Amino acid sequence: MSLYHYFRPAQRSVFGDLMRDMALMERQFAPVCRISPSESSEIVNNDQKFAINLNVSQFKPEDLKINLDGRTLSIQGEQELKTDHGYSKKSFSRVILLPEDVDVGAVASNLSEDGKLSIEAPKKEAVQGRSIPIQQAIVEEKSAE
């Protein structure tokens, strides 16, 4: 690593300053980013069901919303905290396109006491193949009169 840029401030680049400032911000916000809900989510997609499990322990049940529009599942959480000394707001949003073989009419959710949100839907039964017999058309011959 060269110390040339640090001791010659007149020749420092604007982009170098920007990169230094961005790296500083990244280090300062790293603890906040580590607690995001995205790190504690799990998606299960097997032959029997589709399920998503989220850790939403930082949110109250009334702070959560789950919507289903067609096959698009939206999960949102928003919490506001106002005190005499300040204001804090936490939020998250997940949008998931459910697989085509999921029974969207049977989507159900459950929130455990320890803040684990589970959303599950069974898979549709596969349409069984069947053999289709071939019917032969009978053509009547017209006799010449």
UniProtKB/Swiss-Prot annotation:
InterPro entries linked to this entry: A-crystallin/Hsp20_dom, Alpha-crystallin/HSP_16, Alpha-crystallin/sHSP_animal, HSP20-like_chaperone
Single biological process term from Gene Ontology: protein refolding
Positions of the sHSP domain: 32-137
Induction data: Induced by white light exposure.
Cross-referenced CDD domains: metazoan_ACD
Alphabetical keyword list: Stress response
GO CC annotations on file: cytoplasm; nucleus
PROSITE patterns, sorted: SHSP
Range of residues in the leader sequence: none
Presence of the UniProt keyword Methyltransferase in the record: no
Membrane-traversing stretches: none
Superkingdom of origin organism: Eukaryota
Alphabetized GO MF terms: unfolded protein binding
SUPFAM superfamilies in the record: HSP20-like chaperones
Pfam families: HSP20 (PF00011)
Database matches in PANTHER family: HEAT SHOCK PROTEIN HSP-12.2-RELATED, HEAT SHOCK PROTEIN HSP-16.1_HSP-16.11-RELATED
Recorded family membership: Belongs to the small heat shock protein (HSP20) family.
Name used for this protein in its record: Heat shock protein hsp-16.2
Gene for this chain: hsp-16.2
